[in-house]
Amino acid sequence: MDVYPPRRQGLPRARSPGGSSRGSPSVSCSRLRQVQSILTQSSKSRPDGILCILGIDSRYNEGCRELANYLLFGLYNQNTSDFEKTGFSEEVLDDVIILIKSDSVHLYCNPVNFRYLLPYVAHWRNLHFHCMTENEYEDEEAAEEFKITSFVDMVRDCSRIGIPYSSQGHLQIFDMFVVEKWPIVQAFALEGIGGDGFFTMKYELQDVSLNLWNVYSKMDPMSLESLLSDDLVAFEHQWTSFFANFDTEIPFLLELSESQAGEPFRSYFSHGMISSHITENSPNRQPFVLFGNHSTRENLNAGNFNFPSEGHLVRSTGPGGSFAKHMVAQCVSPKGPLACSRTYFFGATHVPYLGGDSKLPKKTEQIRLLSQIYAAVIEAVLAGIACYAKTSSLTKAKEVAEQTLGSGLDSFELIPFKAALRSKMTFHIHAVNNQGRIVPLDSEDSLSFVKTACMAVYDIPDLLGGNGCLGSVVFSESFLTSQILVKEKDGTVTTETSSVVLTAAVPRFCSWLVEDNEVKLSEKTQQAVRGDESFLGTYLTGGEGAYLYSSNLQSWPEEGNVHFFSSGLLFSHCRHRSIIISKDHMNSISFYDGDSTSTVAALLIDFKSSLLPHLPVHFHGSSNFLMIALFPKSKIYQAFYSEVFSLWKQQDNSGISLKVIQEDGLSVEQKRLHSSAQKLFSALSQPAGEKRSSLKLLSAKLPELDWFLQHFAISSISQEPVMRTHLPVLLQQAEINTTHRIESDKVIISIVTGLPGCHASELCAFLVTLHKECGRWMVYRQIMDSSECFHAAHFQRYLSSALEAQQNRSARQSAYIRKKTRLLVVLQGYTDVIDVVQALQTHPDSNVKASFTIGAITACVEPMSCYMEHRFLFPKCLDQCSQGLVSNVVFTSHTTEQRHPLLVQLQSLIRAANPAAAFILAENGIVTRNEDIELILSENSFSSPEMLRSRYLMYPGWYEGKLNAGSVYPLMVQICVWFGRPLEKTRFVAKCKAIQSSIKPSPFSGNIYHILGKVKFSDSERTMEVCYNTLANSLSIMPVLEGPTPPPDSKSVSQDSSGQQECYLVFIGCSLKEDSIKDWLRQSAKQKPQRKALKTRGMLTQQEIRSIHVKRHLEPLPAGYFYNGTQFVNFFGDKTDFHPLMDQFMNDYVEEANREIEKYNQELEQQEYHDLFELKP
């Protein structure tokens, strides 16, 4: 349980309006891995780390800021006013230093910006925070000194450092002396707290800007979201402006020039190119608008940035100087990968049905011919895109495109012209990076780039017998592909692909009426159907806001006005003008509204082939089918029900009546169209005042987008294969069948992990004692006498032996016991939990692997044992709480005090790293709630769909054991020493309690943080279990409980090699040495007596001399001496305070003392003394 209510993940932060969101942890980790890949390239000159310094400390270097924004999803794309909203100065928020190493990250920040950065970085693997506490940060001088020492510590193990010197489009000549002038780099040379010398002399610096630009140019889910919500919106806006030019100039359309028509594209491109600092002269990346016969191959491939002159008008660019029949247009994003080209028409591509047989005039036939060629080109390009998405082969895509073009021409009965047209056709696909640069299609990174597929049919002759050239037809789309590698049951690897056409929402078909007689014909059509004696019968109702859909996959719905008559309907559009559908042309007409007022009402029209000449060419589909969608709550929706519905249900002279159908009566194609209309209605009907989501609207326009985003979220993370059985779960198509997931005969593994001193062992003992009735328990603990915390090979051998032991039992017992057996894995050390998972996944025996399954992983956290100093965490502290792996986090101290600051702070940190984890309070490992115990002993938490998907996204390659967990930093050593002699309890306790005062700051070398083991003290015969936690300064000495122990214990292997030594202590600390540990421990044992040195007169103390005098001053005096009561006097009158024979007395004393010393030394030599680590005989 949480100490406080679970907060929504992510803390408030300043962010520019409309800026990118916080981003998903998987994309964040993927971006970090992309940057780290620069450090793992097979190059002798590759750097050991990439240094990113923000703010004034790097003199606001743009390259560093760009890298930070890439990793932090644009957090520092803010202006001054945004920073002011936070209440903190820019200098405080920019106070960040990031050092990226190949398998870890060091991050310096301050307590203020820590909370802004945390949601972005908490899930990074092997993350090391260099940050002060709030109280420490109040001392400005200490804070500055801490920053310098942190910077020195961060780069200590490097020799070659990469600098992101330049930002994209602003390449600068790298100058390490400029870097040396950066304030924090200058401070590196300070005496006392600095790094003992100049930074640029101690480290080799190199510019990694170009490497990073290649990383930035790759598409991932976040950059795709930005592309869709920002770049694509701006791109489509240019087309909207382009259409507006034509729609407003309809009365004067013939006088419109190419230059005027292309003004939106030209301004958009030229202004963007100026600000992008990118020079791209490829003709494929140039905008253009060309009318009629001016759209020749020569003009299209000229690559000239300037638009043609004002002299090329619609009026004069057709065959023989007549008006143009069509135009080709291309818009190009100047700072992004988007580009698409279209062919639009001047004049009607169809003749409205007016009740009799109407023949197309010759000029309309030319337009119809061009539109049919164009429709075939569109189909060919889309077929080529689909083929390329599946095969990644340009050659195959070109073949498919050419075949599709041929079959398209056949379908329009253009067989006589096929040979002439195919000889003038070209098809190509270009890959474009995020900055709009064309890159090789066959490069290894091309999968992550947007591509543009284009087909052009150049210089089309007047195929209807006229002279001259009609011009060219061009169509292109920007698309993105996604490819997931899938591992089948037999071990083979196949691919699952998906693609989305990004520019598909730009109208593919459009036409404008330019000649007076065409406009008059359109007006005549409107008047004819509204007349009293109209062939469509009586006018019923009409209105705007209807959408016309066709079965043609290449066309999009057209919004227009619909007018209903007793014998048909009229759909009018501002560009396509009138489309008349009489009941005489209908085979049937159905109606579907889902019996709900929130469902789009759909008129489903199955029409006869005789209607085709009276439909625009893009409404010709594989099946003769149209759908008119009426949105709920619209006026036309209500009018249809009141004026049309009842009347049309009655059969008239045509024999056609409206048939109401249910959902099961819809064909697959009809369901697809209705679903698309429903999504569009949902996107357009946001509540008043709520900003319409551009992504939601785009998703309605691009039905395949939602599926592609799911697919791309998986494929963009890594090219490691996904298991076939897991793929539906990853794509959120299905959930794992729980009855299938945990088979009854599998042994459930419950993993409890944590740092030393986290009370994981106590929790383990509690669980085993409490749940003996659940069946048989096996307990695995890590090997103690090893420098590594976890041995995968040892764990795998243990699993094999445990399974073998079960199989050796009788069949009846085995069936019972295997159902009841649980394995509790207790790992108390600096173990990365992913290593344990991968050890099971990569077990060499597939039968063993199949016999065990992980139920849940629980991490124990002792708040007092998390920080080495300040907010610098112990190694693997956050990694032991990783999302996708760990289901529960148990806090084992400070749980009795309400909202203890340390506990709250750690919960906030871990919640950012693992938002889905359950928090459990268990003082000293004792769980008090039944529901918490159920969480820890869960049988399926680890294998839930959410956890499985998170594992694949966060740890690519985990299933096959390919993920490198990274090294432990700082290096923590685990030294186990065995001995057979008792310790002196008082000396041992005193030595332990003195450790805390000797703890050294970074780099922490020689620090002892934990002592644990089993020993005997000289005052008792009982074996005692001791545990000492240095940071908490807590020492526990408890008798070892006698009784059966969980079989088999891994320590038995170690004991065999230790002979008769039955006591051991494990010392855990930083860069410890065994000799030093043994010397420390010897001082806790009974000390070996030392030989006494023989005395000399010079060694006698004044006290000893006085004692000798007092003892012998009454002895007889030699001749010539007498005692006067106070002094000794000779016959010469000399006086002395001491007896005249004092020298003899002292010699006698020394001689006697030396006899005693010699006797003592002789007895000492005869005594047998054993060193603490000496084996017993």
From Swiss-Prot:
Residues 11-27 have a biased composition (Low complexity). It holds the Pfam family DAAF9. It comes from the Eukaryota. Residues 1-27 are annotated as: Disordered. Interacts with ARL3. May act as an effector for ARL3. This is Dynein axonemal assembly factor 9. It comes from Homo sapiens (Human). The gene is DNAAF9.
